[in-house]
Swiss-Prot record:
Organism field: Cowpox virus (strain Brighton Red)
Induction cue: Expressed in the intermediate phase of the viral replicative cycle.
Disulfide pairings: C13-C16
Full protein name: Glutaredoxin-2
UniProt family annotation: Belongs to the glutaredoxin family.
Function: Glutaredoxin necessary for virion morphogenesis and virus replication. Functions as a thiol-disulfide transfer protein between membrane-associated OPG128 and substrates OPG095 or OPG053. The complete pathway for formation of disulfide bonds in intracellular virion membrane proteins sequentially involves oxidation of OPG072, OPG128 and OPG088. Exhibit thioltransferase and dehydroascorbate reductase activities in vitro.
Record keywords, A-Z: Disulfide bond, Electron transport, Host cytoplasm, Redox-active center, Transport
Length: 124
């Protein structure tokens, strides 16, 4: 069973689309799940199944810790049911306007370094 990369992006975001396209190159190593963050957090979105308290905590955590990320990536281990935050910002080159804006070697390194169960995320 492969680990899963969960990509939280925004609709109509060209950077999010380019990141998603680049990360697809890792599909031989990971299952990849793309999540539209706006739809996810809508009142009737998938996050509503968490209940009001957990949903509110999740929204608060996103706002407090991930608001400076255009796109967020987590890795998920389906066997242990643990998640880890992946610091994608280290792999992005914003001077590029296509999927090459993601340095896949750096991203792979960040995925491997991401520690399960650490929250809030440790960023440099």
């Amino acid at each position: 069973m492969k680990n899963v990369l969960i990509i939280f992006g925004k609709p109509y975001c060209s950077i999010c689309e380019n990141v998603s396209e680049a990360v697809e190159e890792l599909k031989s190593e990971y299952d990849i799940l793309h999540v539209d963050i706006l739809s996810f957090f809508l009142k009737d979105g998938a996050s509503s199944m968490l209940g009001d308290v957990k949903r509110g905590t999740l929204i608060g955590n996103f706002a407090a810790h991930l608001s400076n990320y255009i796109v967020s990536i987590f890795k998920y281990n389906p066997q242990t049911k643990q998640m880890a935050f992946v610091d994608i910002n280290k792999s992005l080159d914003f001077t590029k306007t296509d999927k090459s804006l993601v340095n896949l070697e750096i991203l792979k390194s960040e995925i491997e370094k991401a520690t399960y169960g650490v929250w809030p995320p440790v960023t440099e």
